[in-house]
């Protein structure tokens, strides 16, 4: 764990000490995953990992619970497995995906899973809302978006 400045810590949760090989998506599964904590507000930045690494993180002793989850792999079908989502237990999720992207991210199954867990009003998607800005003073969290979405 790295103390960035007083009251702000950053923990690298992935890649593992021994890189994953043979996962079917090694490049994604060895992506950097960070947990940033400022006061009582925490962010889990899940990068491009997929179910393989999410499962690994669930089975480790890392603290995953975070107020904000930046959903893994643009909300692809191979990410945000139920066990991982349950362990993170976010209040807010951000899905970063380009509008009309060729991969169809986020996958409807993942978007629905997040909606069921958090409610639509707590999910922010760059494909629909443009830039998503999260601001915290270490106690409260404010979210603003470039565009409104019904």
Task: Describe every region a protein language model picked out.
Residues 1-150:
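Non-globular, low-confidence helical/coil segments that flank catalytic cores
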